[in-house]
Amino acid sequence: MEVKEALFMNRGEGESSYAQNSSFTQKVASMTMPVLENAVETLFSKDFHLFQALNAADLGCATSPNTFTVISTIKRMMEKKCRELNCQTLELQVYLNDLPGNDFNTLFKGLLSKVVVGNKCEEVSCYVMGVPGSFHGRLFPRNSLHLVHSCYSAHWLSQAPKGLTSREGLPLNKGKIYISKRSPPVVREAYLSQFHDDFTMFLNARSQEVVPHGCMVLILPSRQSSDPSSMESCFTWELLAIAIAELVSQGLIDEDKLDTFNVPSYFPSLEEVKDIVERDGSFTIDHMEGFELDTLQMQENDKWIRGEKLAKAVRAFTEPIISNQFGHEIMDKLYDKFTHIVASDLEGKIPKSTSIVLVLSKIVG
């Protein structure tokens, strides 16, 4: 499986689309807006307001309304600082990045409806451009970005971890699609190694693109436990693996497809992220904290409704990569099974989700 081709959120604006089922990531983005606001203020304290334009990038933007929130927040803070500093009129250039499979049409349609693109106000003119490509490599010219933002994207891996088959070619993570309590230590080690390599590549590419003293605001799903197989980080993938296994038992999916599939994603701990940033040495950590949120952004006591809501949210960001492996024709059955597992086996009990937000500044010299 080529991750660059298979990884994207559900397209369009329909019932299963990411645009209609991203309330959780919207809440995460909303919770971290004060951090982004402070980052923009800090940029102005470093004399970046002397430039005619501020160049910002939102990496892994998908099609969520989050993008509008990010752009409007940066723009609003620029206007505020312009008034406070009595500086010249500024322009804001925002680059929206995701893999080529992303639904950029729906994204820009949404931005245009909110009068972001081409909207000229008194202090700040805003211009937006799409940049398809992998953020694990270079996307922009050297020293061209003042600010980088990424929300719930940097945990995706460039590929499934290597070394998950034995010398005889047998799958080492049989019956699972991610780290689980049953996974041998080599699986956990392979996932951490792949995340280390990919996040290091991410930092290295950004260190070349971000101007001296420029900054990044990164938000990642994470875990509090040192154990990567803890339920807080494995919940979604564990339930999907159970649902897929049930379809295997019914003869609807080939067992080999389950045994050879490993999700290209990793929920790191705060300590793991900190260690990688410090080892890389391109950025200093200005701010770093973890926080918890209810996975479902709704008050609902009915376990079946909770199951259906969670299944829709999960389907919105997992269906493309899952269907690439197992086929489009069984997707309805798979997510119906997922709903049933949440409602019946778990009685609608859904663990909270943990996130990390960090602000990094590029080291000079």
Swiss-Prot record:
Its EC number is 2.1.1.-. The keyword Plastid does not apply. Keywords: Magnesium, Metal-binding, Methyltransferase, Transferase. Mg(2+) binds at N173, D259, F261, N262. The record marks H149, P221, S265, A313, H328 as: Involved in substrate discrimination. Caffeine binds at T25, Y152, H155, W156, F317. One of its GO terms (biological process) is methylation. S-adenosyl-L-homocysteine binds at Y18, C61, N66, D98, L99, S134, F135. Signal peptide: none annotated. InterPro entries: MeTrfase_7 (IPR005299), MeTrfase_capping (IPR042086), SAM-dependent_MTases_sf (IPR029063). Pathway: Alkaloid biosynthesis. Its cofactor is Mg(2+). Binds 1 Mg(2+) ion per subunit. One of its GO terms (molecular function) is metal ion binding. May be involved in the biosynthesis of caffeine. Belongs to the methyltransferase superfamily. Type-7 methyltransferase family. This is Probable caffeine synthase 4.
